[in-house]
Amino acid sequence: MQEPLRVPPSAPARLVVLASGTGSLLRSLLDAAVGDYPARVVAVGVDRECRAAEIAAEASVPVFTVRLADHPSRDAWDVAITAATAAHEPDLVVSAGFMRILGPQFLSRFYGRTLNTHPALLPAFPGTHGVADALAYGVKVTGATVHLVDAGTDTGPILAQQPVPVLDGDDEETLHERIKVTERRLLVAAVAALATHGVTVVGRTATMGRKVTIG
């Protein structure tokens, strides 16, 4: 029987957010991190120039950049981003629109503590075209997923999901915009639950102390 992985509660949790794009998920976490919210963003890591880095700087959050092109191999980049992330001593890492696959060095250090979001109800429609694939298949309901990151593409243990109906006349843009709203709220709730209650992972099953719900 596989040995359980137990990640203890860490509130108030130190968050490192990895991002490559507009920073909408990062902004949601920054906006949430007030009052008694059980997590704070302590650093943002990027792999390119992007709006997310600007949002972090505007919020006086330290930013570090680890570009793949600046390293002789993907393995070397993996070592570098692991070290840069570890320097901020995170309790949790959030991959928030980060357009790189995290490697074995990173996962050996942060597995069970690294979250990702996906704009579909996994395991359906993984990968970068989840919204378009759901529309092409003709589903009537899709949604958002928050999961732990593993070595695969959107294959890690699922922490939380929320359905989003597909409306008549939806195209990829309109559907994706509605999913993004749910995705942001679900991520904020999942981070809070993980920070407060921790998680136990056995194989593909992740169990937290309470169910993740969004209002």
UniProtKB/Swiss-Prot annotation:
Which positions are annotated as binding Mg(2+)?
A: 116-117
Active site location: 118
Q: Which GO terms describe its biological process?
A: 'de novo' IMP biosynthetic process; tetrahydrofolate metabolic process
| Cross-referenced HAMAP family | PurN
Write one Gene Ontology MF term: phosphoribosylglycinamide formyltransferase activity
The catalytic activity of this protein is classed by the Enzyme Commission as 2.1.2.2
**CDD domains per record:** FMT_core_GART
Q: Which UniProt keyword terms apply here?
A: Magnesium, Metal-binding, Purine biosynthesis, Transferase
Spell out the residues of the site Raises pKa of active site His: 154
**Superkingdom of origin:** Bacteria
Task: Enumerate the catalysed reactions.
Answer: N(1)-(5-phospho-beta-D-ribosyl)glycinamide + (6R)-10-formyltetrahydrofolate = N(2)-formyl-N(1)-(5-phospho-beta-D-ribosyl)glycinamide + (6S)-5,6,7,8-tetrahydrofolate + H(+)
Chain sites annotated for binding (6R)-10-formyltetrahydrofolate: 74, 100-102, 116, 150-154
Reported function: Catalyzes the transfer of a formyl group from 10-formyltetrahydrofolate to 5-phospho-ribosyl-glycinamide (GAR), producing 5-phospho-ribosyl-N-formylglycinamide (FGAR) and tetrahydrofolate.
Q: In which pathway does it act?
A: Purine metabolism; IMP biosynthesis via de novo pathway; N(2)-formyl-N(1)-(5-phospho-D-ribosyl)glycinamide from N(1)-(5-phospho-D-ribosyl)glycinamide (10-formyl THF route): step 1/1
List the GO cellular component terms: cytoplasm; cytosol
Q: How does it assemble?
A: Homodimer.
Gene that this polypeptide is encoded by: purN
> What is this protein called in UniProt?
Phosphoribosylglycinamide formyltransferase
The text of the family note is: Belongs to the GART family.
Which spans of this chain does the record mark as coiled coil?
A: none
